[in-house]
């Protein structure tokens, strides 16, 4: 890889001086002391004189805490209090910034045992809709600092804490510092600070006010170096970078003049791209017969021409094109040339790695509009934080968005605020949602007139204003739109639908009579339905088997008053229980469940008639007025996802065990497709729905979305259902469900089993696991796909075979995918091959078994 070089010398001195003056007065700085009481804000921090303010106006929720008392004297004031978030999954700070501005963004976390639990939290940190990093206080000690340099895409910057486990996210401070636009530029994405050293024998950290940009400089000196310093002023000719005088007046060089000056470091991820900034100033008296000249060598490759530092003048070297380090081990060396009589020297060194934030934020005008609507009605929904549309799992309640791809800003297309207790008028900010297709403000207490601007929103297809206190006339322009196909609902309001006069008395009388008749009809219908349930209605007496039915009181006893929680999901909470001295898992339907009685009924009826050793067994169910519950055999090792994601307490699955789990899961799905009459499509195959026994026996679970195929094997139209990332794209596009939809989902599970990767990971360049695998396979690199936790302890032949099988399963065209019987056959072969490898690794297994099904040539692995 060619590396661009750049040496910045004296230029634009006047602009630099003006810039320094602006920086020294903290212009553009944002310094939040998280958890600080509003009545203590603002204050000037004693050491830096930085002005900190309370975070209360920038966050919707959270509670405040204090680090334990024995730490108070050791910490700077911003780190003595904190804000923690026991409620909600995503909690976001919303900061007003300047668009297209280069910011140093620094976030500090100091646990300080504020809760007295000695339980170091672990959670995810997001920048807008993209994951930034995982904060793990257990691995990083009591304090964690994360810093990036990032160019803002809009005037709003969201910094979000996302709960990922049982621990509670917390934060101590947030600091933003504007930088010059053309400094610290990554080739793509942003820069994540790895470290920032200045070379001195002092123990003092340097930051503001010595550093006008409030960078934190860490002191470093190695035993093989000699420390040098000067009291002379060093000219700062580096426009925009502005290194502090205290950094430039000190430095280091090798104690042995013939040795190179060497710095080594290990990257957190071997594939990280590296950017380095080297600050050099000649701060020694160099005699006329002396020369200091050296080359800059990174990983044994020269990256800069021979360089001679200028006396008492600072210069910076950096690479515009990122570097990579083999195996994640990096070595920087300053090596003197044959012409040089003096050893190399260096004053300071900054190390960054590239970080990508690929997902575009929601269209800024849409964000401003929906936040204005939120403010107009005083909405305080816990989900209404951060980006409204992305990531999908954090979509704001009541919104639907059009998300095309990661590079295109999502647009809000539906706003549903029905039954939200809204008061006041319909705000004009709604018209700024220019792509809105559906608007539902029904069943609120809205007053005033129906605004004419609704007629000008050209994409609106549905407007539901029923059940409010609106008055006046419906604008003629809106009635004209209704004639053109707009669905307009304005009943249960004091509204005149036609132009002209109000309803006459006769019309009112007729209306009253009509209402009376309607009420009478509804009463008759209600009485008839009480006598005989309609055929289409789901009734609680429709189950064919009552011999496994339990009362809610029975469930209470089984779970010992719902004492031990072993899992949570879309259905509700799963409790550990005991029935007839046998362990059981009891899944209790939550009142707020996104699923509900229809899926409960589907699962019970299916499991009452379908039995197979690779399907989780239903022991019984509860269906009474007090609640709904499903009672299963207990699978002691939890679900497959927990073991692949490295959940604490879960062991790393060996390669043979992974193949065994894949085969047993495939057998379960195959039985649904071929062994049941009528045939069944699961519709929600994923790693969390594959449960493991104490012996790691795999069984398929969660049949709430399953559909029976009454006629043949042809695809059948149905409402799209499933889980994002596992969903068959052809099914999603056409709404035609087939057995091959399960095959696609199972192919995604196979990729998880092979790689241990998340199905969707926004920190990857190719965030979807299918795209990620396809990209790697272009180079035939199996080692980069297989889970690194296996430490290369796997059979390459069977691994390739499974990768090929997985990629054939996720073919975008369903006809090109294998059926589940073919999948089972191939996995059987893979397991046999693996067993031979395991028993005797001396046996030559380099000749792979050929896949007997058609594989898409575009995604077929190209090398072995």
Curated annotation (Swiss-Prot):
Per the UniProt entry, the Enzyme Commission number(s) are 2.7.11.1
Q: Which loops or segments lie on the Cytoplasmic side of the membrane, by the record?
A: 529-864
Record's Gene Ontology CC terms?
membrane
Query: Subcellular localization, per the record?
Result: Membrane
Tell me which residues bear Phosphothreonine: 551, 718, 723
- Locate the Phosphotyrosine modifications and list their residues: 632, 731
Q: What is its main location?
A: membrane
The keyword Glycoprotein appears for this protein: yes
What UniProt keywords are attached to this protein's entry? ATP-binding, Glycoprotein, Kinase, Leucine-rich repeat, Membrane, Nucleotide-binding, Phosphoprotein, Receptor, Repeat, Serine/threonine-protein kinase, Signal, Transferase, Transmembrane, Transmembrane helix
Position of the signal peptide: 1-23
SMART domains noted in UniProt: S_TKc
| Swiss-Prot/TrEMBL LRR repeat ranges | 411-434, 435-457, 459-480
Q: Where does ATP bind?
A: 566-574, 587
- Enumerate the InterPro entries for this protein: Kinase-like_dom_sf (IPR011009), Leu-rich_rpt (IPR001611), LRR_dom_sf (IPR032675), Malectin-like_Carb-bd_dom (IPR024788), Prot_kinase_dom (IPR000719), Protein_kinase_ATP_BS (IPR017441), Ser/Thr_kinase_AS (IPR008271)
Which superkingdom, per the lineage?
Answer: Eukaryota
**What reaction(s) does this enzyme catalyze?**
L-seryl-[protein] + ATP = O-phospho-L-seryl-[protein] + ADP + H(+); L-threonyl-[protein] + ATP = O-phospho-L-threonyl-[protein] + ADP + H(+)
> What is the topology of this protein in the membrane according to its UniProt annotation?
Single-pass type I membrane protein
Database matches in CDD domains: STKc_IRAK
Active-site positions on this chain: 684 (proton acceptor)
One Gene Ontology MF term: protein serine kinase activity
Q: What residue ranges lie in the Extracellular compartment?
A: 24-507
Name of a matching Pfam family: LRR_8
Q: Provide the glycosylation site positions.
A: 49, 229, 256, 289, 432, 445, 464
Q: Where is the Protein kinase domain?
A: 560-831
Q: Record's family?
A: Belongs to the protein kinase superfamily. Ser/Thr protein kinase family.
* Protein name (database record): Probable LRR receptor-like serine/threonine-protein kinase At1g07550
């Amino acid at each position: 890889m060619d590396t661009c070089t750049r040496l910045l010398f004296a230029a634009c001195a006047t602009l630099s001086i003006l810039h320094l003056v602006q920086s020294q007065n903290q212009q553009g700085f944002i310094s939040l002391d998280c958890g600080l009481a509003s009545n203590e804000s603002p204050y000037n921090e004693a050491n830096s004189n930085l002005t900190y303010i309370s975070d209360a106006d920038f966050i919707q929720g959270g509670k405040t805490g204090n680090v334990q008392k024995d730490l108070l004297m050791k910490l700077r004031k911003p780190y003595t209090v904190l804000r923690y978030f026991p409620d909600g999954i995503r909690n976001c700070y919303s900061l007003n910034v300047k668009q297209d501005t280069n910011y140093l963004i620094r976030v500090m976390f100091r646990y300080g045992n504020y809760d007295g639990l000695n339980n170091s939290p672990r959670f995810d940190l997001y920048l807008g809709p993209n994951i930034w990093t995982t904060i793990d206080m257990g691995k990083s000690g009591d304090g964690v600092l994360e810093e990036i340099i990032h160019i803002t895409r809009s005037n709003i910057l969201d910094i979000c804490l996302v709960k990922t486990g049982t621990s509670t996210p917390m934060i101590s401070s947030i600091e933003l510092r504007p930088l010059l636009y053309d400094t610290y530029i990554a080739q793509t994405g942003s820069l994540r600070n790895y470290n920032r050293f200045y070379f001195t024998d002092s123990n003092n950290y340097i930051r503001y006010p010595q550093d006008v940009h409030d960078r934190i400089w860490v002191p470093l000196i190695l035993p093989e170096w000699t420390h040098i310093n000067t009291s002379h002023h060093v000219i700062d000719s580096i426009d925009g970078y502005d290194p502090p005088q205290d950094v430039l007046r000190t430095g280091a060089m090798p104690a042995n003049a013939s040795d190179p000056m060497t710095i080594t470091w290990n990257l957190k991820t071997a594939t990280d791209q590296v950017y380095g900034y080297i600050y050099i100033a000649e701060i020694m008296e160099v005699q006329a017969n002396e020369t200091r000249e050296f080359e800059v060598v990174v990983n044994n490759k020269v990256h800069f021409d021979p360089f001679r530092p200028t006396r008492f003048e600072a210069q910076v070297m950096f690479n515009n094109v990122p570097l990579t380090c083999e195996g994640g081990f990096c070595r920087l060396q300053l090596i003197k040339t044959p012409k040089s009589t003096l050893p190399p020297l260096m004053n300071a060194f900054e190390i960054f790695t590239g970080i990508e934030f690929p997902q575009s934020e929601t269209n800024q005008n849409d964000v401003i509009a929906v936040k204005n609507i939120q403010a107009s009605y005083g909405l305080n929904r816990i989900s209404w934080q951060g980006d409204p549309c992305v990531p999908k799992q954090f979509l704001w309640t009541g919104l639907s968005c059009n998300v095309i791809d990661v590079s295109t800003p999502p647009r809000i297309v539906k706003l549903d605020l029905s039954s939200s207790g809204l008061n006041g008028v319909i705000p004009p900010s709604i018209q700024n949602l220019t792509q809105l297709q559906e608007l539902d403000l029904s069943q609120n207490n809205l007053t005033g007139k129906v605004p004419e601007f609704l007629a000008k929103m050209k994409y609106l297809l549905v407007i539901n204003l029923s059940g409010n206190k609106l008055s006046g006339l419906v604008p003629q322009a809106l009635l004209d739109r209704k004639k053109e196909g707009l669905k307009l609902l304005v009943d249960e309001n004091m509204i005149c639908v036609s132009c002209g006069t109000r309803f006459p008395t006769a019309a009112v009388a007729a209306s009253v009579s009509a209402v009376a008749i309607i009420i009478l009809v509804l009463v008759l219908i209600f009485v008839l339905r009480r006598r005989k349930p309609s055929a289409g209605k789901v009734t609680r007496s429709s189950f064919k088997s009552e011999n496994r039915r339990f009362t809610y009181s029975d469930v209470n006893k089984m779970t010992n008053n719902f004492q031990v929680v072993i899992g949570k999901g879309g259905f509700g909470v799963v409790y550990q229980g005991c029935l007839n001295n046998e362990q059981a898992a009891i899944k209790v339907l939550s009142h707020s469940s996104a699923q509900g009685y229809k899926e409960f009924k589907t699962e019970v009826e299916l499991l009452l008639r379908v039995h197979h050793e690779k399907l989780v067994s239903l022991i019984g169910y509860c269906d009474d007025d007090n609640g709904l519950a499903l009672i299963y055999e207990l699978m002691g090792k939890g679900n497959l996802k927990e073991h692949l994601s490295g959940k604490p307490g879960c062991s790393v699955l060996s390669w043979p065990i992974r193949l065994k789990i894949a085969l047993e899961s495939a057998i379960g799905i195959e039985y649904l497709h071929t062994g049941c009459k009528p045939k069944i499509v699961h519709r929600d195959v994923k790693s969390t729905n594959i449960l493991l026994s104490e012996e790691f026996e795999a069984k398929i679970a969660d049949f709430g979305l399953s559909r029976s195929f009454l006629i043949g094997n042809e695809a059948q139209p149905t409402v799209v259902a499933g889980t994002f990332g596992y969903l068959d794209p052809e099914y999603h596009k056409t709404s035609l469900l087939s057995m091959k939809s399960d095959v696609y989902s199972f192919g995604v599970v196979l990729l998880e089993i092979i790689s241990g990767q998340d199905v969707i990971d926004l920190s990857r360049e190719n965030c979807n696991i299918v795209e990620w695998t396809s990209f790697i396979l272009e180079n035939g690199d199996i080692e980069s796909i297989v889970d690194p936790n296996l430490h290369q302890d796997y059979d390459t032949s069977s691994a390739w075979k499974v990768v090929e099988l997985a990629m054939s399963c996720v073919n975008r065209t369903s006809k090109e995918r294998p059926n589940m019987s073919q999948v089972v056959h191939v996995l059987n072969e893979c397991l046999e091959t693996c067993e031979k490898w395991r028993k005797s690794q001396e046996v030559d297994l380099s000749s792979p078994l050929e896949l007997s099904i058609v594989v898409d040539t575009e995604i077929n692995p190209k090398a072995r």
